[in-house]
Amino acid sequence: MRQCNRDAWNKTYRAQVSSEYWEDECQEFSFMDLPRRTRFIRHAVATLILLPLALITAMSLCDQLAHASGSLNILFSIPVWYALMGAAVWVVLGSSRLFTSSLLYLYVLGHELTHALAVICSHGSIHAFKADLDGGYIQTDKNNIFISLSPYFLPLWAMLWGLVWGVTYLFWPTVTCQAILYSGLGFWWCFHLFWTAWIIPKDQPDLADNGTFFSLILVYFANLLLFLALLRLFNAVSLHRFLADCIHNAEKLWDVLRDLAMLAAGLFL
């Protein structure tokens, strides 16, 4: 159940979860309840700013990965090799369905914990919290875009894995410890991507309440930036070359849009 005080924007997040579905029982607040000016601004920001930035970032990441794939030193480096091994472990576990309930519970718990951490970062209060296989919710006196969408682009378990590793590495600074870090990041990143892709098509109120188009573009762009940070951690990309690719791809995108605009003008004028 989701309850919303439209004056104070107090919200209760409650999602019912199983291996087949994830849905909110009711929605008292929706994107259409926002002022028309706010809706227009979000659509404009998503279309004119976030979408072009996401396209340029995706194109530049593809260029960087193409450069990296041609370098055996990068492909067989310790970070990339062990991250791929961790990802392979997730693929085996995810496809076997032997631990579906446990993995689903971890995702539900992580989803609600991320909401809770976002509330704390936003100086809000948490009044109730629940996460189990039957459902999960967080009740808070504060809501904003970051609180609503943070579980879709912040891989909580990967972040906690990195935090635990950082403490461990202070006392055990070995190559083995580094291998554990990279393999764990590969596993938990794939875990995050899989469940995020699984849950988004299931009519999530978190996305709809902020405008589905705006939310999807923002989540996509944020995940691209986190993926860039992960690749940089693995020394698989160069920030200097990435920025150069961004400038080049921005010019290409501008040329394409200009040509399309001229073509449309020729057809209708």
Predicted feature residues:
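Membrane-water interface of transmembrane alpha-helices
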Residues: 119-128, 195-197
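Canonical hydrophobic alpha-helical transmembrane segment
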Residues: 80-91
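Metalloprotease/metallohydrolase-associated module, dominated by Zn2+-dependent proteases
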Residues: 2, 6-69, 74-76, 87, ...
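Active-site recognition of the HExxH zinc-binding catalytic motif
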Residues: 107-120
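Short pre-active-site segment immediately N-terminal to the catalytic Zn-binding motif
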Residues: 90-110, 137, 141-145
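N-terminal start-of-chain detector that recognizes signal peptides
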Residues: 27, 78-80, 99-101
